Amino acid sequence: MCMKLKTITAAMLFGCLCAGAVYAAGEVEKREGMMKQIGGSMGALAAISKGEKPFDAAAVKAAVTTISTNAKAFPDQFPVGSETGSAAAPAIWENFDDFKAKAAKLGTDADAVLANLPTDQAGVATAMKTLGADCGTCHQTYRLKK
């Protein structure tokens, strides 16, 4: 009986450990997906700001909306236990309040752009400077160098 109990306990413990690893991997994939969406949105805005694509108010609004939405949800994708397996620096978890503040600033700045949506290429370029600076500040501190 004692041996069965030890075996069952060991199996349950192993299952919990595996479930935790799967959960963390899911969080990494989710946040990487969100970051790719932000990157794609920034790319779309950059193409308009450089004149590579014509100004399209709907495309600008969609891109900035994605940035705003993802920036606000982003900190929730970094639970304790998801520190490995991505380009996320350990500094995120060491300075989580600052990380959250940087994400919030990106969200707030994106909301400001949405409230005063650019009406031309120059306006998109101005918005890109602000949003790009927010991205760069966070990446410089909280993204591992490749």
UniProtKB/Swiss-Prot annotation:
Post-translational note: Binds 1 heme c group covalently per subunit.
Signal peptide interval: 1-24
GO CC annotation terms, alphabetical: periplasmic space
Sorted UniProt keywords: Electron transport, Heme, Iron, Metal-binding, Signal, Transport
GO molecular function, one term: electron transfer activity
Residues where heme c binds: M35, C135, C138, H139
Gene Ontology biological-process annotations: electron transport chain
Recorded superkingdom: Bacteria
Role noted for this protein: Low-spin monoheme cytochrome c.
Protein name in the entry: Cytochrome c-556
Originating organism: Agrobacterium fabrum (strain C58 / ATCC 33970) (Agrobacterium tumefaciens (strain C58))
